[in-house]
């Protein structure tokens, strides 16, 4: 199908939703097949304009009296409001599926996905079997920010309803973290994309198999990082352990140090559908997603 078909289908779906809900509409996704996902607001005249991630979530998280609920910044599943759970549910393809949740303050949030698989190098893959349905799996999403041992850490995470998660992080995962940190710290080259590694089917918590997918890059000609191997290892262990211990089963942690070095670490439970398309898991961009630091992590250090 051409991108024009997806665009027409997209706006046609929105038109139907407006006719039914007569509410302010916020949505996530791409405008058409092949375009990057984003956050959007649709006006009464059907015009769509981009909004920031913070504005998107704060708006749809408003209570009936227009205030952000106290629990809005809580990451734990037991405390997170149902609003966040509802609006982050993903449909497989907006030409076939569309989820609408009518919230208590008359704001409708639509979450869509173009069923686009992204390879490690950022290229788009569209295999025939990609038309999967994820709208029963994603339970909640959060964006968090903190600093550990001098390393800036941000994470974009999802809790999948069908995946199992425990609260024990064992040395098995730590050994793999140490491997890729040593590779990231000591590797160097003359290209901006510094490489990637995959550690599949790591069974570290006694209940669930897990996999790690990591890639690093630099805005300088060298891929070296000035942070010590020990500090980076501690930052990764603390952040991943904290996310796992809060029940996250598919998440990406972005690490940055200085003005040039970046790393993305995707951690995926084997029961999560994202395990089949790990490089499609969203990662926060260091310079763009400016959510305030909250309690998403255990105590930050450094």
UniProtKB/Swiss-Prot annotation:
Protein name, UniProt field: Putative uncharacterized protein YER076C
Signal sequence range: 1-23
InterPro entries xrefs: CSS2_C (IPR046624)
Family classification: To yeast killer toxin KHR.
Residues with attached carbohydrate: 65, 86, 93, 220, 231
Organism this protein belongs to: Saccharomyces cerevisiae (strain ATCC 204508 / S288c) (Baker's yeast)
Short name of any one Pfam family annotated for the protein: DUF6736
Keyword terms: Glycoprotein, Signal
A cellular-component GO term for this protein: mitochondrion
């Amino acid at each position: 199908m051409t991108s024009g078909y997806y665009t027409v289908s997209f706006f046609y779906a929105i038109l139907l939703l407006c006719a039914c809900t007569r509410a302010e509409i916020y949505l996530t996704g791409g405008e058409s097949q092949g375009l990057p996902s984003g956050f959007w607001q649709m006006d009464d005249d059907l015009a769509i304009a981009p909004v920031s991630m913070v504005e998107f979530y704060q708006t749809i998280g408003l209570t009936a009296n227009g205030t952000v609920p106290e629990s809005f910044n809580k990451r734990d599943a037991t405390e997170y409001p149902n609003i966040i759970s509802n609006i982050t549910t993903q449909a497989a393809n907006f030409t076939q599926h569309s989820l609408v949740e009518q919230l208590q303050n008359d704001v409708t949030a639509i979450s869509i996905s173009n069923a686009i698989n992204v390879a490690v190098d950022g290229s788009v893959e569209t295999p025939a079997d990609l038309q999967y349905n994820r709208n029963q799996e994603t339970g909640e999403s959060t964006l968090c920010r903190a600093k550990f041992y001098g390393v800036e850490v941000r994470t974009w995470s999802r809790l999948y309803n069908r995946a199992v998660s425990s609260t024990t992080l064992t040395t098995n995962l730590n050994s793999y973290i140490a491997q890729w940190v040593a590779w990231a710290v000591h590797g160097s080259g003359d290209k901006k994309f510094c490489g990637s590694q995959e550690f599949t089917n790591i069974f570290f918590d006694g209940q669930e198999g897990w996999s790690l997918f990591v890639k690093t890059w630099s805005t300088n000609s060298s891929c070296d990082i000035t942070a010590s191997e020990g500090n980076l290892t501690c930052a990764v262990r603390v952040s991943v352990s904290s996310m796992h211990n809060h029940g996250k089963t598919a998440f990406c942690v972005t690490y940055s140090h200085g003005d040039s070095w970046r790393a993305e670490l995707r951690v995926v439970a084997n029961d999560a559908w994202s395990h089949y398309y790990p490089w499609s898991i969203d990662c926060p961009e260091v310079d763009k997603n400016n959510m305030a630091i909250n309690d998403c992590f255990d105590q930050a250090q450094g």
